[in-house]
C-alpha cells in the first residue's frame, strides 16, 4: 500500500497508512454484516515478516463488513485471532453489543517495530453506547 494515505472504504471505515505503507490506524462505527474473505491476501499479508503461527487477521472483522483485502489485514498470531483468543473475544463482545441494539465505535492502532510488516501489539480504543474501553493486545 502507499505511504501516508487516508481513505474510507465502502462501508464507512476509515484507514490510514504510515511511512512504510503499513496500516497505522483503522476506525469506524461497526455494523453487522458479512464481509468477503480473500484467502490469498490472508495467507500472504506480512510477507517475509509473517510468522508460521500467523493468520491474516482483519482489523475490522468480517462479521462487521470488514474488507478482506490487504487494506484491512495484518499478520496476527492465530492464538489471539481464533476462537478463544483475546482478539476473537473482543470481537464477540462487539457483536453481542450490536445484536442488543448498542452502538459500537472502534479505533485500532497496530504497533510496529522498525520497518517490519508484522505488528507486535494493538492498541484498541472502543466505545459501546458512548462508554470508552481500552484494550492492549500483544501479538506474540
What are these regions (language model features)?
Residues 5-140:
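Domain-level detector of nuclease and nuclease-like folds
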Amino acid at each position: 500500500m502507499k505511504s501516508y494515505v487516508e481513505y474510507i472504504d465502502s462501508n464507512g471505515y476509515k484507514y490510514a497508512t504510515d511511512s512504510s505503507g503499513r496500516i497505522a490506524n483503522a476506525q469506524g462505527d461497526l455494523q453487522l454484516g458479512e464481509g468477503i474473505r480473500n484467502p490469498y491476501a490472508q495467507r500472504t499479508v506480512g510477507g517475509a515478516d509473517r510468522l508460521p503461527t500467523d493468520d491474516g487477521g482483519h482489523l475490522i472483522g468480517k462479521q462487521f463488513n470488514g474488507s478482506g483485502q490487504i487494506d484491512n489485514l495484518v499478520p496476527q498470531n492465530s492464538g489471539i485471532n481464533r476462537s478463544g483468543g483475546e482478539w476473537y473475544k473482543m470481537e464477540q463482545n462487539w457483536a453481542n453489543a450490536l445484536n442488543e441494539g448498542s452502538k459500537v465505535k472502534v479505533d485500532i492502532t497496530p504497533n510496529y517495530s522498525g520497518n517490519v510488516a508484522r505488528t507486535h501489539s494493538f492498541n484498541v480504543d472502543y466505545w459501546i453506547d458512548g462508554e470508552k474501553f481500552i484494550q492492549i493486545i500483544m501479538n506474540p
